[in-house]
Amino acid sequence: MALRLYNTLSGEKEPFVPRVAGKVGMYVCGVTVYDFCHIGHARAGIVFDMIYRYLRFSGYDVTYIRNYTDIDDKIINRANQEGTDYRTIADRYIATFDEDMDRLGMLRPTIEPKATDHIEDIISIIQRLIDNGHAYAVDGDVYFAVETFPAYLKLSGRNLDDMLAGARVDVDERKRNPMDFALWKGSKPGEPWWESPWGKGRPGWHIECSAMSMRFLGPSFDIHGGGKDLVFPHHENEIAQSEGANGCQFVKYWLHNGFVNINSEKMSKSLGNFFTIREVLELFDPETLRFFILQAHYRSPLDYSDQNLREAQAGLSRIYEALAALDQALEKPATAIHLPASAAEFAEKVAGLLPRFREAMDDDFNTAQALGTLFDSIRTLNRLLAEGGGSSSASRADLEQLRAAVTEIGAVLGLFRIKPSDWLAAREAEKARHLEISPEEIEGLIVERAAARKNKDFKRSDEIRDYLLSRDIQLVDTPQGTAWKVK
């Protein structure tokens, strides 16, 4: 089936028809660079990296823009706290963000603009809004007049009158309407500023994204993404100011990923349940975090806990164990591969894997279902390899086809990037760190056991095996040698 995606604007799944056939323009709101990124940022990054990869896999020429908000109240406050310049703070946390994204296996977007590089674009749009009657200047500030834009709140589905009635908005007598939002903020002592027709000042947050997206994608483009928390006010305000300035539809499809909860509670600094990406990666490898995030549909809430991460790592290990067995089987000569003569089920699973993967991904990027199809094939593979039986050259072709399909799926999801034996060895080493025995000692005992067996000293061989078992180390003898794993 053709790609369908859930559009926040309509509240429905819609067929994906880009404005220009074969080309996609996609803008995703990046981070405000004043601190280390948390796992909510990791989810947004991984989700839209997956979408970017799948669109390219589907044959689209994608221009992917993700910005840095490098001027904002939070950045200024952090700079003042540290007694430094806002640019020092922004540059520091741009660098740490890039490091985090690289560790999580992200593809770099086509362009990663900084807000401060587009001040002239921002001023131009604000002036156009004033000229169009959608904005007004007062005492060096410029505000968007929400009542001049009848479609305001069309993305979130809120009602302006209801919001005004129950508003917790600080009353500013200079505003025509309490819901009017800042496009330009007049300078205050100790703050960075730029010259403008309304005096020295700096841009508001919302106008920055409109300016950067329009600069690289034009006044109207295909996909705008971000976290669910950005629907209001950020994306709502982007629509108002962009369509008010240009007189045309700003974005065709709005995509929003769900929240991350911590042990079933919403993640927040005030609750003290706030984890940075770096803190998580001290406990779990990057691919496990990526796999954990992709196990859920991108719009669903995601409950983060150490237990859920451990379960995700166990699931990823099952795939890597199957891939290691598959690679081992494919290293044998074709005539040495023994598979059940009744391997028709496996052949059917393999032939259908990529089509079923595409079907799941075409259904609003349903990675949960897509991974389910992969696990289905892996289970059949494990059963097949365990049974043994007759041999077939066609069965080898099925194994090769499965390996190629998993590699292709991995490229779309950003998974299975590591040699299976290396990944499994790293996980065993992690487990061994919590044992009273080192990997080096284990390997030394394996060498000693091999020598004992060669010399037919089976008593010593059994003693070594039993000793390791008492330390929760299980030995696995294979034609290629002896491996070990933590029980």
Swiss-Prot record:
E.C. numbers: 6.1.1.16
CDD domains the UniProt entry points to: CysRS_core (cd00672)
Record carries keyword Cell membrane: no
Taxonomic superkingdom: Bacteria
One protein family per Pfam: DALR_2
InterPro entries listed in its UniProt record: Cys-tRNA-ligase, Cys-tRNA-synt_Ia_DALR, Cys-tRNA/MSH_ligase, Rossmann-like_a/b/a_fold, tRNA-synt_1_cat_dom, tRNAsynth_Ia_anticodon-bd
Cofactor: binding comment: Binds 1 zinc ion per subunit.
Subcellular localization: Cytoplasm
Residues annotated to bind ATP: K269
Principal subcellular localization: cytoplasm
One of the GO BP terms on file: cysteinyl-tRNA aminoacylation
Molecular function in Gene Ontology: ATP binding; cysteine-tRNA ligase activity; zinc ion binding
Keyword terms: Aminoacyl-tRNA synthetase, ATP-binding, Cytoplasm, Ligase, Metal-binding, Nucleotide-binding, Protein biosynthesis, Zinc
SMART domains referenced in this protein's UniProt entry, alphabetically: DALR_2
Catalytic reaction(s) noted: tRNA(Cys) + L-cysteine + ATP = L-cysteinyl-tRNA(Cys) + AMP + diphosphate
SUPFAM superfamilies linked to this entry: Anticodon-binding domain of a subclass of class I aminoacyl-tRNA synthetases, Nucleotidylyl transferase
Cellular component terms (Gene Ontology): cytosol
Binding site for Zn(2+): C29, C209, H234, E238
Short motif ('HIGH' region): ranges: 31-41
Required cofactor(s): Zn(2+)
Family label: Belongs to the class-I aminoacyl-tRNA synthetase family.
Subunit field text: Monomer.
Name used for this protein in its record: Cysteine--tRNA ligase
Organism listed in the record: Trichlorobacter lovleyi (strain ATCC BAA-1151 / DSM 17278 / SZ)
Gene this chain is encoded by: cysS
